[in-house]
Swiss-Prot record:
A GO MF label: structural constituent of ribosome
Database matches in NCBIfam families: S6
Keywords: Ribonucleoprotein, Ribosomal protein, RNA-binding, rRNA-binding
Name of the protein in its database record: Small ribosomal subunit protein bS6
Source lineage: Bacteria, Bacillati, Bacillota, Bacilli, Bacillales
SUPFAM superfamilies tied to this protein: Ribosomal protein S6 (SSF54995)
Similarity remark: Belongs to the bacterial ribosomal protein bS6 family.
Gene3D superfamilies: 3.30.70.60
Family annotation (InterPro entries): Ribosomal_bS6, Ribosomal_bS6_sf, Ribosomal_S6_plastid/chlpt, Transl_elong_EF1B/ribsomal_bS6
This protein's GO CC annotations: cytoplasm; ribonucleoprotein complex; ribosome
GO biological process: translation
Amino acid sequence: MRKYEVLYIIRPEVDEEARKALVERFNKVLTDNGGTVEKTTEMGKRRFAYEINDMREGFYVLLNVTAEPAATKELDRLMKISDDIVRLMITKDEK
């Protein structure tokens, strides 16, 4: 198992309840595929450096996870399908 950092941005117009459900859904994808979510940091709404798809801000979420590459690949696939995710980045944590 490897350590990963997952940073994703949720559309700003998603309400708080739906946003929390979305975070839980993506955490569950990782745990269902044998990974563990060590830390979830909701960084809040932030302004973008440049406009993305006619949006100027988004809600940032950072996950620190331990998982197999297949679990992160499945998470990446599901996040790319979701209309509520503006951007995502999954990186190996080398610590």
